[in-house]
Amino acid sequence: MELDRPFLQLPFLFDTEVLTAEVDRLVPENWLAHPSGLSGNTAVPLVSINGEPRDGFDGPMAATAVLRRSPYLLQVVSSFGEVVARSRLMRLAPGAEVQEHVDFNYHWYSRVRIHVPIVTEPTVRFFCGAEEVHMAAGEAWLFDSWRRHRVVNGSAKDRIHLVVDIAGSARFWGMVRRVQRADTVEAPQRLAFDESRESELLVERFPAAPVMAPGEMAAIVSELMSDCSANPNNNAKELEYYHDLLFDLVHDWRNHWSLYGFMEDGVSGYQALLKRTQAGLRPDPRVLVTQSNSVGINPIINQRLLAAALKSRRSKEFVTGSS
């Protein structure tokens, strides 16, 4: 999700001694390799699909066994008072780097990631847009994942962050606005470990509709085309071509939605519209490039739109609340 600045420190402070003690109790088998095979990058799922130790976004979230037996981690994740999406402990090995990239898949269209550093050093640097920061242990940070960003662990030990993905309620975004507009840094709310506290963890049950709503599809397409149109280096004819290709999808999707909604009878028609659009993409993935972050249009279309628009296997669960 886009923010109005690269980084934003939230007014929270957590006890890293207790967090570190819980992390130290983990066993090597808890740490999973990065799904893309990134060297030096491992993670422990804390909130995941059905609470299973795996990656993935598309399914009902639940606390994993690791989170359930880590009371302070559970208190920290719950303390934001928000509905939580996929969340993890992320470990970056000494000298390792997360290469520059942009988070543009559908998950990030409406979500932000809260970082809570647990084990870190001043030589761990987070770069986002034109800025860089060191996120100190126990703090809480947001960053704009639509900007190009990277992380460098320049220290001699593992860097471990708790990361919590949320869409955020009005209360949360009101807090963000208050912090952004403040002339002085707000005193942080300290959350000490409380053995007696019962944590209520709210998790996403429906991270995406089985069929993307026409209004959401129109918003994604409009924002993407506006971003590409703002780039003076893009070809006008190609802008026109992609405008027509994508808005043809929006209009026909809305028509089909009006007839079928989430009904099984409509799936083949939705699939045909997605296939038609996929076939219409130019071979060059960077035939058009966004002005905001210099990403090619095709990967964004594929990840944010085509791969996310139809999850028909979850239709019954979405309507009835059970699979």
What are these regions, as identified by a protein language model?
Residues E82-V84, A93, Y109-R113, E121:
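Short connector loops at helix/strand junctions that flank enzyme active sites
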Residues L89-H107:
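Conserved short histidine dyad/triad with adjacent acidic residue
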Residues R111-P117, A140, A156-G174:
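A short hydrophobic beta-strand segment most commonly corresponding to one strand
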Residues P117-A137:
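A short beta-strand-loop-beta hairpin characteristic of the jelly-roll/cupin
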Residues E100-H101, V124-F126, F143-D144, R148-S155:
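Short beta-strand His + acidic residue motifs that chelate non-heme Fe in jelly-roll/DSBH
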Residues G215-S268, A272-K275, A279:
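Extended amphipathic alpha-helical scaffold segments
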Residues V163-N235:
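Charged, amphipathic alpha-helical linkers/stalks
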Residues M1-S79, E186-R197, L246, M263-S322:
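Non-heme Fe(II)/2-oxoglutarate
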